[in-house]
Curated annotation (Swiss-Prot):
Keywords: Protein transport, RNA-binding, Transport. Belongs to the NAC-alpha family. This is Nascent polypeptide-associated complex protein. The lineage of its organism: Archaea, Methanobacteriati, Methanobacteriota, Stenosarchaea group, Methanomicrobia. Homodimer. Interacts with the ribosome. Binds ribosomal RNA. It comes from Methanosarcina mazei (strain ATCC BAA-159 / DSM 3647 / Goe1 / Go1 / JCM 11833 / OCM 88) (Methanosarcina frisia). The keyword Transport applies. GO terms for biological process: protein transport.
Length: 120
């Protein structure tokens, strides 16, 4: 690909020459040290990358992160605060279990849970 960059037998590149060429092109590559895990949070789950190797490449002022490791997806569980359950119970006169279920079904939306229980 690059003239004069062939390694032994025309395969691969000399790492020192590669680094020099990248520097000339304005590309800086650094490894982020001592990374234990990387967590990417989405609306539905967390993607956890353990034993992560993170490389940061800077090109023309823009940083790109490359992450390699053991990936697992962890679904988010909806945490319903006790105060919300109590409020739904007071407003609708239902049991704690019914209030909790209504809040789970409404993704924690108090008004939606109360309306659903009131119209049932």
């Amino acid at each position: 690909m690059f003239p004069g960059m062939g390694g032994v037998g025309g395969r691969g590149m000399n790492p020192a020459k590669m680094k020099q060429m990248m520097k000339q092109m304005g590309i800086d590559v650094k490894e982020l040290k001592d990374v234990e895990e990387v967590v990417i949070k989405t609306a539905d789950s967390n993607i956890v990358i353990e034993n992560a190797n993170v490389t940061i490449m800077t090109v023309q002022g823009s940083e790109t992160y490359q992450i390699v490791g053991d990936v697992k997806e962890v679904p988010k569980s909806l945490e319903i605060p006790a105060e919300d359950i109590k409020l739904v119970m007071e407003q609708t006169g239902v049991s704690e279990e019914e209030a909790r279920n209504a809040l789970k079904n409404s993704n924690g939306d108090l008004a939606e849970a109360i309306v659903a229980l009131s119209s049932a």
